[in-house]
């Protein structure tokens, strides 16, 4: 009767295999994390597009919307269903609460009300953007600058770009320079 022999891995072979696996995982993890962030940027763009579409529809019907309560307006009129309140937020930013002010920021204007009556091209007018309240580190309902007591700013959280919704209904990922060229407040973070 033949004697069965079993081949065992040597310690060296096991360590070499383990080191190869660790090196490959170290190479792949940053790529996977980058892919996850790109997916969040795309989801943010979709959420902003939905919010922007509701805002433009509301403005087209009622001619004016308050910068202080635009989210309440969209929810109350059903332009954004209560079940889809998360579409008013960027998924890349961790929420500490779910208040109506923890959302995309609307451009702050004199009188706190927006209309469709602007000078210039609607494709150059920023209406919504990724926002941040510098005092609380939360998204905020509007933005205009970091001067005085007001620290409500555009936040460049997507690889040094902010998603911005324009009055023509388009949403683009834009750098600080691009938004400044569009007349967006220069007070940014």
What residue spans do the PLM features occupy?
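Short, well-structured segments within or immediately adjacent to enzyme catalytic domains
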Residues: 37-189
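Short, Lys/Arg-enriched N-terminal segments with co-localized hydrophobic residues
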Residues: 1-3
């Amino acid at each position: 009767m033949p004697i069965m022999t079993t081949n065992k891995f040597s310690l060296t072979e096991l360590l070499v295999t383990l080191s190869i696996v660790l090196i490959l995982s170290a190479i792949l993890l940053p790529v996977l994390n980058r892919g996850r962030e790109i997916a969040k940027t795309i989801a943010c763009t979709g959420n902003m597009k939905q919010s922007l579409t509701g805002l433009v529809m509301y403005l087209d019907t009622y001619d004016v919307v308050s910068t202080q309560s635009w989210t309440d307006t969209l929810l109350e009129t059903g332009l954004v269903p209560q079940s889809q309140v998360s579409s008013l937020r960027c998924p890349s930013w961790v929420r500490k609460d779910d208040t109506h002010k923890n959302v995309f920021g609307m451009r702050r204007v004199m009188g706190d009300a927006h209309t469709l009556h602007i000078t210039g091209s609607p494709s150059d007018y920023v209406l919504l953007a990724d926002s941040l309240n510098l005092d609380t580190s939360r998204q905020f309902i509007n933005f205009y600058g970091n001067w005085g007591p007001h620290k409500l700013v555009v936040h460049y959280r997507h690889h040094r770009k902010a998603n911005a919704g324009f009055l023509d209904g388009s949403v683009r990922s834009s750098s600080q320079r691009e938004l400044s060229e569009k007349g967006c407040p220069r007070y940014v973070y």
